[in-house]
Amino acid sequence: MASVAESSFPLLCQIKTQRRINSSTLRHSRVSYHDLPSGSLSFRSRSFVLGHRCKCVSRVEASGSDDDEPEDALQATIDKSKKVLAMQRNLLHQIAERRKLVSSIKESTPDLDDAKASSKQESASSVNANTDATKKEIMDGDANGSVSPSTYGKSSLSKEPEAKTFSPSTESLKNRKQSSASVISSSPVTSPQKPSDVATNGKPWSSVVASSVDPPYKPSSVMTSPEKTSDPVTSPGKPSKSRAGAFWSDPLPSYLTKAPQTSTMKTEKYVEKTPDVASSETNEPGKDEEKPPPLAGANVMNVILVAAECAPFSKTGGLGDVAGALPKSLARRGHRVMVVVPRYAEYAEAKDLGVRKRYKVAGQDMEVMYFHAFIDGVDFVFIDSPEFRHLSNNIYGGNRLDILKRMVLFCKAAVEVPWYVPCGGVCYGDGNLAFIANDWHTALLPVYLKAYYRDHGIMKYTRSVLVIHNIAHQGRGPVDDFSYVDLPSHYLDSFKLYDPVGGEHFNIFAAGLKAADRVLTVSHGYSWEVKTLEGGWGLHNIINENDWKFRGIVNGIDTQEWNPEFDTYLHSDDYTNYSLENLHIGKPQCKAALQKELGLPVRPDVPLIGFIGRLDHQKGVDLIAEAVPWMMSQDVQLVMLGTGRPDLEEVLRQMEHQYRDKARGWVGFSVKTAHRITAGADILLMPSRFEPCGLNQLYAMNYGTIPVVHAVGGLRDTVQQFDPYSETGLGWTFDSAEAGKLIHALGNCLLTYREYKESWEGLQRRGMTQDLSWDNAAEKYEEVLVAAKYHW
């Protein structure tokens, strides 16, 4: 009898004895539905013949025939029928409103034809699901009126997620008839080729919804309880599959002219959210939270970034990171972007384009070849020449004149790339084009663009932007070096710069600053510093004269490479990937793995301090050396990684020898070790005397490592001083390059680490939740390019 109850068959038998009844002795008949007056519903059945031990249970007839069933059961059935009809009327009202809404949307937006078809199909699916639910409610309600509550007291409709509507095939019906002769299903949707004949005010359901023949379909929609079916709109988050053959044929009955009570706002939201659901389902795992930036729209341009290095092909510092990451973010915004860089070695991705050009440098004809690779939506063009080959380990190597000749050749070839290099079969051309030159190595490009082309009416609409990454390197030399750049004599004044110490000299950066349409620095703080006597390195007067075209934009970071959740260098040696959610587990594990790898005592309670950078006076390594004795007295561990000046390299070796159980000095550079120190350290030191932008502090904050920095340049822009009262800030800063100032800031940091864990966790959380990606910086670069484009 459990199977009978679960299948919700309309004929229920009350067994009066414990004797098992053979199913072969049961005889059954079909249930017929006849038209009745409005507000009533008739069911007629024949009784089961169960022998002398089984009592027949008959259905109640609405015509008033004699019956043994109590009158309250009859009244309950009638009330249920009225409720069902009311629900059906409300449902059809809402369907009609949906049709009107979709039709209006189609008229205003022709592209939503597919959405209209989807809405109709889902409406038909909702009708089928609600029809099954209501009929099932009648059956169970009638059963509750006829059978003991102890046996059938709970309706199957109360099971919200478990009950599902489905349409079995004809073969399954035949099998059911053969296997069970005791009962037969009277559900109106059991046959996929025969629509329901339930009467609705004289008209069958088949004249309102569904075609004459519906193909079998797989079960998909979940039937809910009657109390939750007032709104037929399927949830946008979980759209149900509908039958493809549903359509609307006859007009609605007269009693369905009442306005619906349900608002159409949900329907509008459904239509809007449908594309989002589809797109979220097609996203790859791990990338669903990554959303593309907005497109440039009318501001889309052809952009060519020219640099002496570009990660991952060639890199010595932050310039390589910028050249490798910024173009990809610009391309994601819809721009056509190219990167031009020397070909220092053979790169597997780059293919020879077969383009050959010859340029004269210092009286010699030099041939260049162009190689091309298309990576992440960006065209990478490599300029090949014997002057560039075999310099991958020392791209700025050679004497002053050798470097100057290489850069002259590189800039001459780069400025003509949009004419001669077919990327994807089509050259960029010189219309709607902007060059982005970087540092003094490519500062000749704006000068060549103006002298060779724009002064002669060629490339009139091409613009140039010069980015200052480090103004200390300027391409200086004697005035006689002007003969190597191959420019008209009246351009000599652009290169001349008077130095109070060395007198008048040749300066490539000075000429580039004057010729460029816009000038950028890699942080707001650095854009202010280069205008001062101390920070301008002799170029401050030129910068102040051209202040109108200056702007600072903070660099971003590659959030795919420098991300603790996906860092490939944390996959082995007991390291682990982590995110903000499991920071309290993942970071201590990386710390223990780093201590173990470097041979330090594995102590989770000891603060681990790290330094990653060039061993140079600029980076403040000498300040760290002065503070080492104090640090070792504070029961901390110190790890330093870098290469540079020999005397500072020796400082690292002596430090490790003297404090063997507390300090490690790694002379050299390893990308893997840099990632692991960033992940395993608690604190990162950056006491740079000047820092145009700095990237290590950005990497550290993204990994939950707290920076202690000298407040200069980009460090001042990116690391806000921690305020314990308002619980704001990202780290600790000190205002002058002195060992005492460094010790004071680091002492406060260590105190917070040991005594105020909640504040420390807040610092980590704020650092890791920042948007440090290149998408923000790319938007600001786009603003500068547009400003240069419309500057005449």
UniProtKB/Swiss-Prot annotation:
The transit peptide extends across 1-55
Q: Write out the catalysed reaction.
A: [(1->4)-alpha-D-glucosyl](n) + ADP-alpha-D-glucose = [(1->4)-alpha-D-glucosyl](n+1) + ADP + H(+)
Which Pfam family is one of this chain's hits? Answer: Glyco_transf_5
Pathway involvement?
Glycan biosynthesis; starch biosynthesis
Q: Region Disordered: start and end of each range? A: 105-295
Q: Which domain of life is it from?
A: Eukaryota
Q: What class of enzyme is it?
A: transferase
Which residues are recorded as binding ADP-alpha-D-glucose? K315
Q: What keywords are assigned to this protein?
A: Amyloplast, Chloroplast, Glycosyltransferase, Plastid, Starch biosynthesis, Transferase, Transit peptide
Task: Report the protein's function.
Answer: Involved in the synthesis of glycan chains within amylopectin in leaves. Is required to produce chains with a degree of polymerization of 12 to 25 (DP12-DP25).
This protein's name: Starch synthase 2, chloroplastic/amyloplastic
